[in-house]
């Protein structure tokens, strides 16, 4: 009797698995192209597709008219927790010594008339693509927003080299996660926490459409968005990056945003749309300590019903890729979890997109989590668990070590082929083989008034009135208004992170035509009526 019952249960499980339709319906012609390309690739070419490098390694930041601002140096060092002794010693250095020490980092240590210019090293780029077969590049140089023309030049050259040496286009990725945050002159939208507060999926979809258009205007086909980390702990520094704490809201918003970014057919994404990388799969927004990239401890029910659900909906909506949680869930690093990466996502949902790590996260399996003895062992664990692409920003060591693992039989060739098949599929779906570059003609609406109006509407609908004692709002003209607080006259607080620079630290320089809260109140009520303290 028990044997028969087990057999029936197993049979039902098999039938259920077989009945699960692919999250993205397969296109036979596209799949044939993927298989044909895959069959012609060498092991080196396949492994190169699985590596994503930071653009900074292909160029150099030069400084003209360099003059160090020592108060900025002091502030930067204190911000990053350096000791008083190190701060004191650094301030005694010459300007050039300070530049040599700190100039390579995305921090502002210069006086106002200093110019920082990033130059692409074509020889280095040539080597990385011709020798190491690198298939993906990311980021803005120095994490500071370039112009559209600069993006067209740099990504255009990357695609030229990729097609010349590999016959496979690069898939370039940027954190364009509340508008084109890494492109000057484009449209910034309110942060996702604001977009969630609108409860308006049409606004979210329209914002994604505009961001996709302006990303492609800058020749970028892939964005690291949407973010659907349930933000349930106000201590967590990245609450603003998601749609909030509710699984239903995040699920509804992520579907709308994916449709806006990618269009209605994920197999055929047109030149005005981009591929999405829904992140951070999953439970990244539930750190036990409240600090970023720290462990989550959750019940199985909470994991399945709440934290997994928005990602399930993203997969079913056709997101091309997902970025993985940097930390661990109940003691298991997500980058090492076959159950989470392969079974739940790729097998149970029949999702055929690819999984990319976050910044250098495979390294954490040995350096922080201690589940691997060294980097090579960490690569073995992560790739076998289901990671398809490693964001290993500064080194090609990944390629060397993964090849050794394949030759030693520790990573099966079938796993390599599966990963590369998924990456090629995404590139075909984006139309990159037919049109590696976009931008220029057809993208004249970049940064237009229509797009700005859509952003303003989203900002207005996101406003939540918490208190209005004595009906003081709306403010009457002709009265004195006290405005106080550290953010009252700063632009950075209005944008938040991922705004022109990684932490939004250069927002003042790149948003001069806009107003701070103080400036806006002065314009409306008269400077003589505003008291700033």
Task: Annotate each PLM feature.
Residues 1-23:
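Bacterial Sec-dependent N-terminal signal peptides
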Residues 18-533:
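Glycoside hydrolase catalytic-domain context in secreted enzymes
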